[in-house]
């Protein structure tokens, strides 16, 4: 692996995963807006409530108490329906966000496991043994090559470096 550009494949995979992870909230919000179109009904209900409140402000409570009370009950009922609708939409958005996150992390884990299995025996790169002397066996795992950097260590380092770079950029 050290001779070719496979290290670049691993690095670009890690970069892409971290980039997608950065935009995950936006992606899940976009998907929830596509799948749940309740916003139009909510807007209708809000405008209807506003109209009824305007009408309520024109009615004298002393002169037309029965009409005033009916309209007030109607407003309260519609407000409760709106709250229920908003609560339902919020729950659906949370569920969509949870599903998108779980799907992403499953795909990311599958990608990382496939990279580890593919490059299990080969070092990603070979450096002088003195550079990594105290941790040489740990860094070389699972390849076991002296002075080699194994795929697991490479993935951990790449994930951390890419995450720090993306955090600094955003």
Curated annotation (Swiss-Prot):
Molecular function in Gene Ontology: protein-membrane adaptor activity
Lumenal side: 1-6, 118-137
Keywords assigned by UniProt, alphabetized: Coiled coil, Endoplasmic reticulum, Membrane, Transmembrane, Transmembrane helix
An annotated GO cellular component: endoplasmic reticulum
Main location: endoplasmic reticulum
Family stated for the protein in its record: Belongs to the WRB/GET1 family.
Function: Required for the post-translational delivery of tail-anchored (TA) proteins to the endoplasmic reticulum (ER). Together with CAMLG/GET2, acts as a membrane receptor for soluble GET3/TRC40, which recognizes and selectively binds the transmembrane domain of TA proteins in the cytosol. Required to ensure correct topology and ER insertion of CAMLG.
Protein name per UniProt: Guided entry of tail-anchored proteins factor 1
Naturally occurring in which organism (per UniProt): Danio rerio (Zebrafish)
Organism phylogeny: Eukaryota, Metazoa, Chordata, Craniata, Vertebrata
Chain's gene name: get1
């Amino acid at each position: 692996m050290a001779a070719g550009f496979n290290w670049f494949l691993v690095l670009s995979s890690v970069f892409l995963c971290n980039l997608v992870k950065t935009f995950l909230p936006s992606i899940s919000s976009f998907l929830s807006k596509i799948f749940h179109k309740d916003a139009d009904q909510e807007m209708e209900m809000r405008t209807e409530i506003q109209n009824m409140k305007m009408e309520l402000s024109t009615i004298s409570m002393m002169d037309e108490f029965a009409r005033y009370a009916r309209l007030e009950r109607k407003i309260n009922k519609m407000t409760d329906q709106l709250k229920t609708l908003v609560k339902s939409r919020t729950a659906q958005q949370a569920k969509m966000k949870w599903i998108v996150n779980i799907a992403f992390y499953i795909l990311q884990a599958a990608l990382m496991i496939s990279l580890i299995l593919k490059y299990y025996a080969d070092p990603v790169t070979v450096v002088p043994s003195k550079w990594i002397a105290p941790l040489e066996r740990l860094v070389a795992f699972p390849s076991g090559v002296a002075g080699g950097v194994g795929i697991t260590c490479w993935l951990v380092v790449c994930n951390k470096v890419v995450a720090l770079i993306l955090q600094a950029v955003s």
